[in-house]
Regions:
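Conserved short hydrophobic interaction patches
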Residues: 27-31, 74, 145, 149
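A generic structural signal for alpha-helix starts
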Residues: 15-19, 89, 137
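Short structured motifs
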Residues: 7-8, 38-40, 52-55, 79-81, ...
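Hydrophobic ligand-binding cavity/cleft-lining segments
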Residues: 1-49, 176
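Hydrophobic-ligand binding "helix-grip"
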Residues: 34, 59-109, 113-117, 171-176
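Short, well-structured hydrophobic secondary-structure segments
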Residues: 46-62
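A conserved amphipathic terminal alpha-helix motif
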Residues: 113-176
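Hydrophobic pocket/interface hotspot
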Residues: 20-25, 70-71, 108-110, 142
């Protein structure tokens, strides 16, 4: 089966200061499952400072699927990469960056390179159409699930006025 490279990008406004948004987005852990549209179980293995492997178990159509991702976090640039090690998008890579947009707001800048197997060779126009569809789906997930969850989570009051650990603040933040 041929493989196509789907290149796409989008920006998503966030109702949070850049540092808080970055910390929230890169605080990966086992409680992330409710973020996703389908049932997901997550484990995190920290390899080194700023490098980790996420292992997600999903159940599309009732069948178990394991997806591992290598994540590299760069706090100085408020960015991270997510490279699929296996699963349906093996070797696909996604780049995220949080950019300040004033003192209380920020935006996510996303660049994706999704490598997908297709049943036959596609024309340039067909590849462009698939890339646009993928971009709409990913940006829609951020718009509908993650951005609102981030805003809700960071707005939630801390118990007894103490700073909450990010993991507790995230509750069950939305999807991608």
């Amino acid at each position: 089966m041929p493989t196509v490279a789907l290149r796409y990008r989008f920006r998503q406004p966030l109702d949070a200061p850049a540092e808080a948004a970055f910390a929230w987005c890169t605080d990966f852990g086992p409680s992330d499952g409710p973020l996703f549209a389908q049932r997901t179980e997550r484990s995190v293995r920290r390899l080194a400072d700023g490098a980790l492997v996420l292992t997600d178990i999903t159940y599309p159509n009732g069948r178990r699927r394991r997806i591992r991702r290598l994540v590299r976090i760069d706090p100085a640039r408020r960015s991270w990469t997510n490279t699929h090690l296996d699963g349906p998008f093996r070797h696909s890579q996604f780049w995220y960056r949080i950019v300040p947009n004033g003192p209380r707001r920020s935006r996510l800048e996303f660049v994706g390179l999704a490598l997908e197997s297709v049943p036959r060779r596609l024309s340039g126009a067909q590849v462009a159409t698939l890339a646009a569809e993928r971009g709409r789906a990913d940006s829609g997930a951020w718009r509908r699930y993650l951005a609102p969850a981030l805003a809700r989570d960071l707005a939630a009051p801390s118990p007894r006025g103490s700073p909450r650990p990010l993991r507790a603040r995230r509750l069950a933040r939305g999807r991608p």
